[in-house]
Amino acid sequence: MENKIQLSKDEIIMGFVASCVEDVADTLCVDYSEAYQRMDAVNMIEEYIIPNYEVLHSESRKNVTEGLIDTLKRWEESV
């Protein structure tokens, strides 16, 4: 008998958020913690990624990452 781990919707979304932070960090050639701190400073995770999860997770990884970087830079400029 095969035991499968069942993840909650929140766990799935948090996994997606983590992958977004990792991809932004890799693309910008910065540490994961720096990318997270920048995104957190403008509330991007709570105000953009989580509320738009359904749309974002259906996009290609490349488009999501490019969009996140563009959004991050615009939001940082407006602070």
Per-region residue spans from a language model:
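C-terminal alpha-helical interaction appendages
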Residues: M1-V79
